[in-house]
């Protein structure tokens, strides 16, 4: 059974960074269970909240939650990379705040049937969007050893990716999450297993591949700033070093000073970036926030 309890990560930091006005237009590109969106909607009684999620169950659940607060929201079952098309459909050109939480929601992890957790028995799945065909079962049982090696390194920077790819291909068919987890622990050297459960990184790599997460993020970032109003902000919460490097590089490209230091006139600053980490209190109350980092890009008013 799926738990609907989800504690939004860095909620206070999101609200503080956005400092929303009552007429603002806000986009939550990773709606989830509307943990962030519920609180943002309360801040914009005369504005508009736009929520997007790949997971239909997230849309259904969030709609009921948000309706208890107001009616000034629109929800879409879609990939966040489609935001430009959705805004055109809504005839909106600029927004005041954009939130992207790249973490998987607690209900998805806790629902054994979704196949995201290496601690719960389930058919290998890991699809955010249950309408798509590609799932973890197909990847684990059909990809070549070379393909598996590449995705394990590309999506989770697993150093012994070739060794793990060989273990997987040598033990097919692999049907379930726990079966894969047991195989990894059985055939990898004991010192590796003792140091860190190898399933964590392998499951991350598979999930990223199934949902095309890196490509979707890169595509999204291309046009994100163009839809920001002046003083608008983009907040992106990441949970691993690969995502964070992508976001850091993207945000950094807007604050890099291309004007030589010795010139008498410097280019006026157009953007600023701030970084936030979970507080000690949040870490104690929600251990899943441990690896979270939020970067916020602000478009400065000219």
From Swiss-Prot:
Span list, region Disordered: 283-302
Keyword S-adenosyl-L-methionine belongs to the record: yes
One example GO MF annotation: rRNA (cytosine-N4-)-methyltransferase activity
Gene3D superfamilies: Putative methyltransferase TM0872, insert domain (1.10.150.170), Vaccinia Virus protein VP39 (3.40.50.150)
Top-level division of the source organism's lineage: Bacteria
GO biological process, one term: rRNA base methylation
Annotated keywords: Cytoplasm, Methyltransferase, rRNA processing, S-adenosyl-L-methionine, Transferase
EC number from the UniProt entry: 2.1.1.199
InterPro entries: RsmH, SAM-dep_MeTrfase_MraW_recog, SAM-dependent_MTases_sf
Catalytic function, reaction form: cytidine(1402) in 16S rRNA + S-adenosyl-L-methionine = N(4)-methylcytidine(1402) in 16S rRNA + S-adenosyl-L-homocysteine + H(+)
Start-end of Basic residues biased regions: 290-302
EC main group: transferase
One GO CC term, this protein: cytoplasm
Function: Specifically methylates the N4 position of cytidine in position 1402 (C1402) of 16S rRNA.
Protein name: Ribosomal RNA small subunit methyltransferase H
UniProt source species: Mycoplasma mobile (strain ATCC 43663 / 163K / NCTC 11711) (Mesomycoplasma mobile)
Lineage per the UniProt record: Bacteria, Bacillati, Mycoplasmatota, Mycoplasmoidales, Metamycoplasmataceae
